[in-house]
Swiss-Prot record:
<feature type="transmembrane region" description="Helical">
    <location>
        <begin position="15"/>
        <end position="35"/>
    </location>
</feature>
<keyword id="KW-1133">Transmembrane helix</keyword>
<keyword id="KW-0597">Phosphoprotein</keyword>
<keyword id="KW-0472">Membrane</keyword>
<feature type="glycosylation site" description="N-linked (GlcNAc...) asparagine">
    <location>
        <position position="47"/>
    </location>
</feature>
<feature type="transmembrane region" description="Helical">
    <location>
        <begin position="512"/>
        <end position="532"/>
    </location>
</feature>
<dbReference type="InterPro" id="IPR007311">
    <property type="entry name" value="ST7"/>
</dbReference>
<comment type="similarity">
    <text>Belongs to the ST7 family.</text>
</comment>
<dbReference type="GO" id="GO:0016020">
    <property type="term" value="C:membrane"/>
</dbReference>
<dbReference type="Pfam" id="PF04184">
    <property type="entry name" value="ST7"/>
</dbReference>
<keyword id="KW-0325">Glycoprotein</keyword>
<protein>
    <recommendedName>
        <fullName>Suppressor of tumorigenicity 7 protein</fullName>
    </recommendedName>
</protein>
<feature type="transmembrane region" description="Helical">
    <location>
        <begin position="62"/>
        <end position="82"/>
    </location>
</feature>
<feature type="modified residue" description="Phosphoserine">
    <location>
        <position position="386"/>
    </location>
</feature>
<keyword id="KW-0812">Transmembrane</keyword>
Length: 585
């Protein structure tokens, strides 16, 4: 009984759904019936005669004006559609029709099981897309005072965008502050300094924090029962204040290194004290986490200073020690600094060892990892590689491995080859990058172009093979080959990260859809005809008549030729043959 009741309810439900689906036809016939019944009270016949009289009295100028107005409106719609496509990469009309009109017209599948399966199947790719569109801190970022500001002084251009600097301010607040900073006056001042937008205000706050720490406290130490001496003890220095001054006030790398060494002394003392107290409560644990971030940042920047000043082996040692001491702090991506320094030393065996550790499927990829792996593979065959010889005898196993590594790197970031091959000019890299985007390509090529030039034939091999990647992934936004589909958000994020004077590289190249080009041509042609007809009505009439006569005469000529050939064939009894043979005869 229960099953019978359930079946009856399902049938009733399906009947109701069917009736609502075709209810609009019923309404249509009802409206027609009402119009027929009310034709006399509504005076429909009189109204129709009035409308026909009005249409008969219209002059050709009205139709010309109507055509011109419609062309103007179509042109405005076209301009808006083109602007929307350039900004967002999709058609506004297509997006509205797919997103809003299609559900109303029943284009969405109502099967919940299919929707759930598809959503579960796409969840991994969606998460990967979100992670790839995340903005990362550039591990090879330059110094603001010693490098970025000097570029501004020379060229008058700002190499950093407000969005990029705002992200850096957020990073500084995350790494260098904690909830207990208000207990120490210097840290409280620095907590406000990291939020300042004005560089001079930040520098003044850092000096103020250091001046507060110059206050001396006297500690009474009894030596003899009858006498005491006074020992002068300095309060611990503020390491974050030295960091800010080294980053923004120092005008040379040498000055920045001196300030970072002072910051290292202060930061190392704070780190040791907080390490002993970290288990006494959550507050001390937060302080220790902050002091750890400060110490790692200082040591990494000191290693980068040594690398800039030519002491590359010292920089490599500092980076290796830092990675051994803090192996879990992967957010700074110190291994990318190490790879660049090892390539400068031409220690390719050590580079391969680092890649074997970090070029893992479970770790996030980067342009540095992918292109460095491609450089090592290309180094083995690039000096003897020749496109002509390869086309004759085919690629060897080593050459095939090198080409596959290049294709893998190009698929991950297709913008890099244009900078390595110097097809696009380089600019100073931003402080933040978007993986697989133009910003990451600039950051990589800025430091690694010299390493590719040093390997003989590497750029030649890259030039001959990098475009072959795009044949394997004809639709990169929908499906990738070795990586996930290329994220759509890279262009928008790169425009926020890179300065306005740089032309952002876009992949894949967006081409205007055919219907936009067709609409543009049709609107332009119609508007031109309307304008010419309005200005020169007699001349356009003669032109139109001449075009019609020419078209009709061409049709008649073809018909006459065909009829003549058919009569000749009938009289001579010639078998049917292609028309070209008749003309030859």
């Amino acid at each position: 009984m229960a099953e019978a009741g359930t079946g009856f309810l399902e049938q009733l439900k399906s009947c109701i759904v069917w009736s609502w689906t075709y209810l609009w036809t019923v309404w249509f016939f009802i409206v027609l019936f009402l119009v027929y019944i009310l034709r006399v009270p509504l005076k429909i016949n009189d109204n129709l005669s009035t409308v026909s009289m009005f249409l008969n009295t219209l002059t050709p100028k009205f139709y010309v004006a109507l055509t011109g107005t419609s062309s103007l409106i179509s042109g405005l719609i076209l301009i808006f559609e083109w602007w929307y496509f350039r900004k967002y990469g999709t058609s506004f009309i297509e997006q509205v029709s797919v997103s809003h009109l299609r559900p109303l017209l029943g284009g969405v599948d109502n099967n919940s099981s299919n929707n759930s399966n598809s959503s579960n199947g796409d969840s991994d790719s969606n998460r990967q897309s979100v992670s790839e569109c995340k903005v990362w801190r550039n591990p090879l970022n330059l110094f603001r005072g010693a490098e970025y500001n000097r570029y501004t002084w020379v060229t008058g251009r700002e190499p950093l965008t407000y969005y990029d600097m705002n992200l850096s301010a957020q990073d500084h607040q995350t790494f260098f502050t904690c909830d207990s900073d208000h207990l120490r006056p210097a840290d409280a001042i620095m907590q406000k300094a990291w939020r300042e937008r004005n560089p001079q205000a930040r520098i003044s706050a850092a000096h103020e924090a250091l001046e507060i720490n110059e206050i001396r406290s006297r500690v009474e130490v009894p030596l003899i029962a009858s006498s005491t001496i006074w020992e002068i003890k300095l309060l611990p220095k503020c390491a974050t204040a030295y960091i800010l001054l080294a980053e923004e006030e120092a005008t040379t790398i040498a000055e920045a290194e001196k300030l970072f060494k002072q910051a290292l002394k202060a930061g190392d003392g704070c780190y040791r004290r907080s390490q002993q107290l970290q288990h006494h409560g959550s507050q001390y644990e937060a302080q220790h986490r902050r002091d750890t971030n400060v110490l790692v940042y200082i040591k990494r920047r000191l290693a980068m200073c040594a690398r800039r000043l030519g002491r590359t082996r010292e920089a490599v040692k500092m980076m290796r020690d830092l990675m051994k001491e803090f192996p879990l702090l992967s957010m700074f991506n110190i291994h990318e600094n190490l790879l660049e320094a090892l390539l400068e030393l031409q220690a390719y065996a050590d580079v391969q060892a680092v890649l074997a550790k970090y070029d893992d499927i479970s770790l996030p990829k980067s342009a540095t990892i992918c292109y460095t792996a491609a450089l090592l593979k290309a180094r083995a065959v690039s000096d003897k590689f020749s496109p002509e010889a390869a086309s004759r005898r085919g690629l060897s196993t080593a050459e095939m491995n090198a080409v596959e590594a290049i294709h893998r790197a190009v698929e991950f970031n297709p913008h890099v080859p244009k900078y390595l091959l110097e097809m696009k000019s380089l600019i100073l890299p931003p402080e933040h990058i978007l993986k697989r985007g133009d910003s990451e390509a600039i950051a990589y090529a800025f430091f690694h172009l010299a390493h590719w030039k040093r390997v003989e034939g590497a750029l030649n091999l890259l030039h001959c093979t990098w475009e072959g990647t795009f044949r394997m992934i004809p639709y990169p936004l929908e499906k990738g080959h070795l990586f996930y589909p290329y994220p759509i958000c890279t262009e928008t994020a790169d425009r926020e990260l890179l300065p306005s004077f740089h032309e952002v590289s876009v992949y894949p190249k967006k081409e205007l859809p055919f219907f936009i080009l067709f609409t543009a041509g049709l609107c332009s042609f119609t508007a031109m005809l309307a304008l010419l007809t309005h200005q020169f009505p007699e001349l356009m009439g003669v032109f139109a008549k001449a075009m019609i006569d020419m078209f009709c005469s061409a049709e008649l000529r073809d018909w006459n030729c065909k009829s003549i050939f058919m009569r000749v064939e009938d009289e001579l009894e010639i078998p049917s043959a292609p028309q070209s043979q008749h003309f030859q005869t």
